[in-house]
Amino acid sequence: MERPDKAALNALQPPEFRNESSLASTLKTLLFFTALMITVPIGLYFTTKSYIFEGALGMSNRDSYFYAAIVAVVAVHVVLALFVYVAWNEGSRQWREGKQD
């Protein structure tokens, strides 16, 4: 059996990422917004249904389901918009830092 030389091994190495800290930052952002996407709409649904629509406004059970669902859908869209905004700014910041090098 032949032993591969070092030049051949170096050619097979995977490409290096720009920065390990940028990967960690991106992963933290993604996990943060994933947690928000799960907790905020569900929490707002039950909170607004029980305390606002049925409690404060005195709506029926059927009506409170409907309006609480609307609040949850709006919350999902707000979280998605915030994620897109943060991801867009993070990407442009990393691009500017890479361009200055």
UniProtKB/Swiss-Prot annotation:
The record's section on Pfam families has: VMA21
Q: Which GO terms describe its cellular component?
A: endoplasmic reticulum membrane; endoplasmic reticulum-Golgi intermediate compartment membrane; ER to Golgi transport vesicle membrane; lysosome
Chief subcellular location equals: endoplasmic reticulum
Which parts of the sequence lie on the Cytoplasmic side of the lipid bilayer? 1-25, 87-101
Q: Which residues lie on this side of the membrane: Lumenal?
A: 47-65
Query: Where is this protein found?
Result: Endoplasmic reticulum membrane; Endoplasmic reticulum-Golgi intermediate compartment membrane; Cytoplasmic vesicle, COPII-coated vesicle membrane
GO terms, biological process:
regulation of ATP-dependent activity; vacuolar proton-transporting V-type ATPase complex assembly
Membrane-crossing residues? 26-46, 66-86
The way this protein sits in the membrane is described as:
Multi-pass membrane protein
| Domain of life where this protein originates | Eukaryota
Q: Which UniProt keywords apply?
A: Cytoplasmic vesicle, Endoplasmic reticulum, Membrane, Transmembrane, Transmembrane helix
What disorder is listed for this protein?
Myopathy, X-linked, with excessive autophagy: A muscle disorder characterized by childhood early onset of a slowly progressive proximal limb muscle weakness (especially in legs) and elevation of serum creatine kinase, without evidence of cardiac, respiratory or central nervous system involvement. Histopathological analysis reveals diseased muscle fibers that are not necrotic, but show abnormal autophagic vacuolation as a manifestation of excessive autophagic activity in skeletal muscle cells.
The subunit field of the Swiss-Prot or TrEMBL record says: Associates with the V0 complex of the vacuolar ATPase (V-ATPase). Interacts with ATP6AP2.
Family statement: Belongs to the VMA21 family.
- Function summary: Required for the assembly of the V0 complex of the vacuolar ATPase (V-ATPase) in the endoplasmic reticulum.
Q: What is this protein called?
A: Vacuolar ATPase assembly integral membrane protein VMA21
Q: Organism classification, top ranks?
A: Eukaryota, Metazoa, Chordata, Craniata, Vertebrata
